[in-house]
Amino acid sequence: MNPNQKIITIGSVSLTISTICFFMQIAILITTVTLHFKQYEFNSPPNNQVMLCEPTIIERNITEIVYLTNTTVEKEICPKPAEYRNWSKPQCGITGFAPFSKDNSIRLSAGGDIWVTREPYVSCDPDKCYQFALGQGTTLNNVHSNNTVRDRTPYRTLLMNELGVPFHLGTKQVCIAWSSSSCHDGKAWLHVCITGDDKNATASFIYNGRLVDSVVSWSKEILRTQESECVCINGTCTVVMTDGSASGKADTKILFIEEGKIVHTSTLSGSAQHVEECSCYPRYPGVRCVCRDNWKGSNRPIIDINIKDHSIVSSYVCSGLVGDTPRKNDSSSSSHCLDPNNEEGGHGVKGWAFDDGNDVWMGRTINETSRLGYETFKVIEGWSNPKSKLQINRQVIVDRGDRSGYSGIFSVEGKSCINRCFYVELIRGRKEETEVLWTSNSIVVFCGTSGTYGTGSWPDGADLNLMPI
């Protein structure tokens, strides 16, 4: 083959290869464009427009990136839309309670800027648990912390942090409040926030970060609510509110709320004589609350709320071992399933209990007359028998000599059952500890367990000699 023929042959082969490559590139381009248009069902968006899933509210978004011949195709996987919680699973069977969380707020205040608080509680959305408290508009290491023993001021706000995160300066102030309750319906948070004059206070209902409704004090005597979580079932949330005397007849109402709007109000009915600071839990298809009788009884009132027909039934925890403080000692205390026991009825403290068949789990201070120590136990037949005093599975949460305070319940939905948890407020400062001028708290949290557990004590632990005065 002469040189000219070689050149012609090489050129022909090169041209053929180039032509094949050209058509391959065209085929790849056509394939890419076809896949792109097929993804959006041939509805091509304008340039730079993001195609959203339906529904357009995307709460947990996942984007999958696919690389194809240097062309990026974004494929959006639509999450399951948020649904209202119905709490229809059974209650978990437990043997006792295991440690869950402790925020150490007072100890941390010795060297950092931590809010002065009281009336803490815990509530969970479907993914996380949060701690709440009523702040005093100041940090502890601040002269404004003087005289924060006062319950109601215009500076108090509801604080919210992820559980275990102390209320630092970056904490969100959810609303203005000196009394509150919060709960998540499966789609958004509802906050009930009470503030204003003692004789003309306002309750604001904030849903998904927006003020939706409000109600004014109906008895003009310190409108107040639960100081723990409310409960939502299938989009309807219930909250117990009281207005009137703290040591006599008061006017208690149960409000039914849907996405922040009050849709119905029921008046307390049944045999409960005085109801404050209820600790409520879902008891499908309704809601059950165990409250504080600040007038006649050291046995705790019960409220059963029917979500569907808005009916209310009230009574008292039967257990012969009673849960309020002050109370008689266990050997001489008595109870009644329908009426207050008329033993050490004046004053009291927020607390909790929940039914377990005919039995009852409860928590209370160890000291019968003051807010010292904290214990939990199960009373056999305590939900059905007023003479029941058989106590099992007792646990010490805070030793007898250390301060405690309010306590309350919150519920956590698991894969197969609903667990009950509780928190204990660990109050420090005035009135009892006069070496400082402030009053604040930390918290400790336990949750029900079907496993084994040990012993211990989890007090606040701050040395007031190391604290700001």
Predicted regions and their residues:
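Beta-propeller fold detector
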Residues: 168-171, 214-220, 264-268, 313-320, ...
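Extracellular cysteine-rich, disulfide-stabilized repeat modules
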Residues: 289-291
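Single-pass membrane-anchoring alpha-helices
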Residues: 2-38
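Structural motif
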Residues: 200-206, 248-253, 297-303, 370-380, ...
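Repeated scaffold domains used in trafficking and secretory/extracellular systems
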Residues: 97-99, 103-105, 119, 173-182, ...
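Blade-level signature of beta-propeller repeat domains, shared across WD40, Kelch, NHL, RCC1
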Residues: 425, 436-469
